[in-house]
């Protein structure tokens, strides 16, 4: 079956766990994908989780926050989910990628601002031929609940619950999500991530935690904040985000 052969995700398909480890089934597909199943026939809903063994520790030193930012844009669809006309949208998407590289390389603030305006115009054009929330809508339409994700130092995971009879549809949508993602609304999502960073700076627990990490693991990637440094968040490269995805979001990982 094409779906199973090409599935690039680590799926923990569980309903609930009566006793930790009881009834656990684990196996590995030919492409290296590890699959874990816990079964509880007393429940009607399934809890599906896709985990990737990567996080802030794998962020490039000059582009911190990538793992977390990637988590955000993994909800924006694929070349089939979320597009009204991919033939029209794709060249605009490629222009946006190139413009972010151009803006990151530009030192002149005035020229940088001008490139930002070009990106804004291209984003508006792309928005006319895309529906960035279609992935989330599809999950909800099949009875999916609590669609969410989280990024840690070594792990990023995506999860939601759904009716058991929808498992084939969930697998199909999830596999497409991880095989052919399109990182739409990069511009507006960056603002969301930066606002999350600002809220963290107002949170004493977050500030203390980041301080302890920076001292306890000084000189090591564990010293970084998952959210990244503000100077990196303000000067993003979509091409680096795509590279991070290609490097780490693989079946065996």
Task: Give short role names for the model-derived ranges.
Residues 10-13:
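Short, linear, compositionally biased motifs with a strong N-terminal bias
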Residues 32, 41-92:
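Active/ligand-binding-proximal structured segments within catalytic/core domains
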Residues 39-41, 151:
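Short, low-complexity Ser/Thr-rich regulatory SLiMs
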Residues 23-25, 31-33, 44-50, 63, ...:
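Envelope-exposed proteins and targeting segments
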Residues 28, 86-253:
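Charge-rich, well-structured scaffold segments of protease-associated domains
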Residues 1-8:
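Bacterial N-terminal signal peptides that target proteins for export
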Residues 19-21:
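Boundary at the C-terminal end of the N-terminal hydrophobic targeting segment
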